[in-house]
């Protein structure tokens, strides 16, 4: 039976996000998150990648075109893709290639960082992601805040992390807010949004033409 390949939804900017491109979409306000239990994670500067139970992977585009920086991941996914149920897919950031921000990882395996599990039209809750990563020896994107949505607390958590990384000579792109609980894919924009820091350089064309590896 063939498996349907599905593009990951577009993430809208929070209204207080500091950096946008011309084709980005922005929420009119953040009222949808009021009273919501959320998980806030670091927004990593990599390639959005979807993994299926049969080991097939694709980036945001569904054209199936492969690139050299995806080759290691195509082999690595066989370590865990068998743990995905029928109708389930795993989404993570492929950080093998350096984009605008360079990273240094303890191992090459850490350059794939999970941020979503989707099954039969629903984004699974955050604890399911943590469990899947624990059982399969995977790394998920770092959590900087968890609790009732509070803009001020979230921004403070981000600034604290930004300062911590700066002291280590590292940069940070921004953060992603998501509902801690399960929600339907059809309502993605009601449950997920992003913040990108000021002056984050968008260099997709450049990094592909002269790409280099991150450090492992």
Each model region followed by its residue ranges:
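Core nucleotide-handling region used for phosphoryl-transfer chemistry
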Residues: 1-216
């Amino acid at each position: 039976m063939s498996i349907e390949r599905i593009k990951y939804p577009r993430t809208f900017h929070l209204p207080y996000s500091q950096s946008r491109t011309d084709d980005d979409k922005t929420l009119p306000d953040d009222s949808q998150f009021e009273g919501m239990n959320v998980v806030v994670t670091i927004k990593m500067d990599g390639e959005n990648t979807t993994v299926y139970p049969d080991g097939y992977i694709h980036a945001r585009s569904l054209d199936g075109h492969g690139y050299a920086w995806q080759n290691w991941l195509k082999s690595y996914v066989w370590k865990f893709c068998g743990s995905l149920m029928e109708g389930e897919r795993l989404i993570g950031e492929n950080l093998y290639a350096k984009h605008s921000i360079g990273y240094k990882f303890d191992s090459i395996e850490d350059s794939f960082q999970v941020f979503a599990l989707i099954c039969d039209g629903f984004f699974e809750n955050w604890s399911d992601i943590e469990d899947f990563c624990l059982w399969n020896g995977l790394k998920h994107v770092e959590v900087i805040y968890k609790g009732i949505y509070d803009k001020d607390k979230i921004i403070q958590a981000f600034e604290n992390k930004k300062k911590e990384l700066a002291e280590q000579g590292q940069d940070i792109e921004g953060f992603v807010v998501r509902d801690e609980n399960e929600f339907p894919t059809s309502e993605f924009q009601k449950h997920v949004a992003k913040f990108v820091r000021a002056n984050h350089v968008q260099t997709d064309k450049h990094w592909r033409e002269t790409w280099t590896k991150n450090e492992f």
